[in-house]
């Protein structure tokens, strides 16, 4: 995959966070003074979410200037443009790309998973189920099988779904807590799902067809919520801690090995980018901007 690394000079915040746990012998101590200038003016709505890097290194987010848009920063550019406007009434949340460059978008008001085929700007409904609460975040296996979290915030409950290569949806589990962040590990044999209000991260065994089994508690926090998650190549899980203003890195053994302090308090999602794939971009709802820090390893897709 071609990757990009260029400064977002007008509205993107590069925040090299503070390393909190010295026990990770692979970490480099980072000081908050390493942060670049914070630009408070933002052209995104409070729905800023869905950070993702496409096949050619372009950087994408949702809700530029107004809800219902997908923003793109071209490789080598210093500014975002509106890449597509979603159909009337659709608003994106999570974004993921498959290995051929197709974009998938969780459209929460209309209970859809949307697709934009690589090389086009045509938005189509890839999957739909009216019984969903609201598809929130997405995860994808190397073979293209998708998963979506499906929270019901009012009832503090949620589900997880599988979407196969033909767009058929299968309910994997219901009656969970408020399912939110979701991710597949590098070996494609574990699915992670977090419950924001309940502050728990669950792990499932995953087979090549996207079936899950052997659910177990992977990690539980005692305060604040969670949002989006991503894995690096070593299987470490990067978790946006909504309200805490940090990204926490958890090893495959369930041990917190790093805590990165952000300038904002409400991170909504994370994604890997940069020349080597080791820059973590973080969207923040309260600031309506993006921050970044350097990871020890590239993201799982690099």
Predicted segments — roles?
Residues 206-268:
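Glycine/small-residue-rich hydrophobic helix-like segments
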Residues 81-85, 124-128, 170-174, 213-219, ...:
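Beta-propeller fold detector
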Residues 42-59, 87-107, 112, 129-159, ...:
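Beta-rich, blade/repeat-based domains predominating
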Residues 69-71, 112-114, 159-161, 200-202, ...:
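A short loop-to-beta-strand structural motif that recurs across blades of beta-propeller domains
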Residues 23-46, 215:
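A short helix->beta-strand "capping" segment at the edge of beta-propeller domains
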Residues 74-78, 117-121, 163-167, 205-210, ...:
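Short loop/turn segments that connect beta-strands within beta-propeller blades
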Residues 14-15:
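C-terminal motif of bacterial Sec signal peptides marking the signal peptidase cleavage site
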Residues 60-82:
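Beta-propeller domains
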């Amino acid at each position: 995959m071609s990757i990009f690394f260029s400064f977002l000079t007008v509205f993107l915040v590069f925040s090299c966070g503070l390393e909190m746990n010295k026990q990770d012998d692979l970490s480099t101590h980072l000081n908050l003074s390493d942060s670049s200038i914070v630009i408070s003016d933002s052209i995104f709505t409070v729905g800023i979410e869905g950070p993702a890097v496409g096949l050619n290194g372009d950087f994408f987010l949702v809700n530029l200037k107004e809800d219902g848009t997908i923003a793109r920063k071209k490789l080598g550019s210093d500014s975002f443009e509106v890449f597509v406007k979603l159909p009337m009434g659709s608003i994106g949340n999570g974004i993921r790309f498959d290995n051929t460059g197709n974009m998938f978008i969780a459209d929460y008001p209309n209970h859809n998973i949307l697709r934009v085929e690589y090389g086009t700007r045509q938005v189509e409904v890839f999957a739909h189920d009216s019984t969903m609460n609201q598809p929130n975040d997405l995860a994808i296996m190397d073979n293209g099988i998708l998963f979506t979290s499906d929270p019901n915030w009012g009832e503090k409950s949620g589900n997880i779904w599988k979407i196969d290569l033909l767009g058929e949806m299968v309910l994997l589990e219901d009656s969970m807590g408020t399912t939110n962040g979701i991710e597949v590990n590098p070996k494609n044999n574990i699915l992670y799902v977090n419950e924001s209000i309940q502050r728990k991260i669950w792990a499932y065994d995953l087979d090549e067809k996207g079936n899950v089994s052997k659910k177990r508690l992977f990690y539980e926090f005692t305060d604040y919520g969670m949002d989006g998650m991503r894995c690096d190549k070593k299987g470490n899980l990067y978790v946006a801690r909504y309200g805490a203003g940090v990204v926490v890195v958890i090893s495959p053994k369930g041990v917190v090995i790093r805590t990165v302090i952000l300038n904002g308090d409400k991170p909504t999602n994370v994604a890997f980018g940069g020349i080597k794939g080791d820059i973590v971009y973080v969207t923040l709802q309260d600031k309506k901007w993006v921050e970044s820090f350097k990871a020890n390893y590239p993201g799982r897709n690099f």
